[in-house]
Amino acid sequence: GREKEARSAVNVFATRERREGAIPPVLYLSAEVAPLSKVGGLGDVAGSLPAALAALGVPIVIITPWYQGIEERVPLARLPIELSVPLEGRVERFRVGRAWLPSGVTVLALANDRLFGQPVIYDEPRDRERFFAFSRAAAEFARLFPPGIVHANDWHTALALVWLHRWFDDRRDGPRHALVLTIHNLAHQGITDIGYARRLGFEAEELLFEEWQRYPGTINVLARGIHVADAITTVSPTYAEEIQTPEFGEGLDGLLRYRREALWGIRNGIDVELYDPATDPVLPDRYNAEHLEGKVHCKRALQAELGLVEDPTALLAGVVSRLDHQKGLDLLLEVIDKVIARGVQIALLGAGDPELGRAFQALADRFPGQVSVRLGFDPVLARRIYAGADVVLLPSRFEPCGLGQLIGLRYGAVPVVRRTGGLADTVQEWEEAKGMGFCSMRPLLQHSWRRWSVPSRCMGALMNGVYSFGRRCKAR
C-alpha cells in the first residue's frame, strides 16, 4: 500500500532488486541546493553535480531540508512518507515533499516546522539540533529505501553516515551502503559537547577521538564522518594536500593523514548551462566567446546601475564574496588605495563581517564614481557584476576550490587570485595569450589600467576553458 506508493514516487529507488553491473543509485545529502536554497558554493555544487551525474546515467536523488519559502521557487508535492526521529527524549516527525530541479533530478525536501519552518538556512546556535535531526531523518530514509551510495556534504549531513555505519556495519545480510563524504570547508566541523551526543543516543566513544580532539569535552561530527566514510573527497587536489598539514588542517590533519588512502581531491566545476552569458535572462545584453559586443553593453549598464563613471576603457574589477577573514577582503583593503590610484573601478557585492562592510562602505564614500559597494546577497546583481567586470578579485587566504573564478571566466572576467587551494588548481598564470588569470595582485599595482582591453581571441579562450561538472564527471 503506502510503502509501494512511496517507493514508486521515489523512482530511482523503485525496486530493491538491482541488475548485476548496474550503476548503484545515489542518495545525495546537502544542507542547501540551488535554486531551492543557497547561501554559498555548497548550494551551487549540490544543484549542479547531481545533474551532471544524472546526465551520465547515474540514478540520483537529493535530500535537503524544506525551508520556509522553497515551495515558492519550485512546486512541491507531498509524499505518503513520514520519518520519525528520536531527539532528546522526544520524537521529531518529518514530512517529505518531492520536487524536480530544472535538470530533472528528483529532490526530496524534509519538512519539520519547528526546526526548519523559517526562511533562513543557517541559524546559529540552533544548527546543532536542526542538522543532527535532519541527518538522522536522512539516515532513516536510507534505511527504508536503500540506495547503493549515500553521499553526504560537510558536517551538516555527516552524522547520517555515522548512523548508517552504526546500523549496518556489522550486518552480513541486507544492504550495505557505500558511504561518501565531501568536505567543502574543513573549518566548519559541527563541534558540540559530549552530553548532547549521549542525549542523542550515542556513546561518547562513538564520536570522540582523543588523539584528534581539538577541544576537551566535545565531540566532532565531521571528524567522525571522516572516520566512517568509505571515500572522502574534497573540492580540489591542492586543498586535499593542504588539509593534511597543520597550517590548513583545522586540527584534523592527523586524522586526514590517517585516511589519506581514501582521500581524493576532485576539482569543482560549474553548471555551464546555468551560467551562460549567451542565454542569461538577467543580463542587459547577451554574448558568447565569438560575439563579445554584448559584454561591452553589460559593462556600460553595470557602471550606470552602480553609479560608476561610464568609461568603457577603465578596468572594472568585480568582487562577489562573503566578507570574512577566509576570503581575504582585509588583505584587499590593505592595497586597494594603490589599485584605485591606477585607475581601476571597484564593484563589490557581499555580506558578512559588519566591520569589513563599514570599511568598504567608507571607501565608496571616499571614491564616488570609482567604487561601488552593495552589502547583502543579490544573485541577480552578482551575475551582472560577472558580466560587466573585466576582472574578478579573489584574494582568499585559503580556498577549498572557489566558484567565483570559474563563473568569472565563463562570463569573460579575468580572475585575479591568491595562489591557494582550488584557486591554484583552476587559474593558470597569464602570459601573453596563454593562461587564464593572475595569481597575485601585483599586476594591478604595477600598471596603469586606464586603457584596458583583452584581445578577442584571448577572451574566447578564457570563456571556453571553464571547468564544468559534466567535463569533470566524464573524466572520472
For every predicted segment, state its role.
Residues 2, 7-476:
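Catalytic cores of nucleotide-sugar-dependent glycosyltransferases that transfer UDP/GDP/TDP-activated
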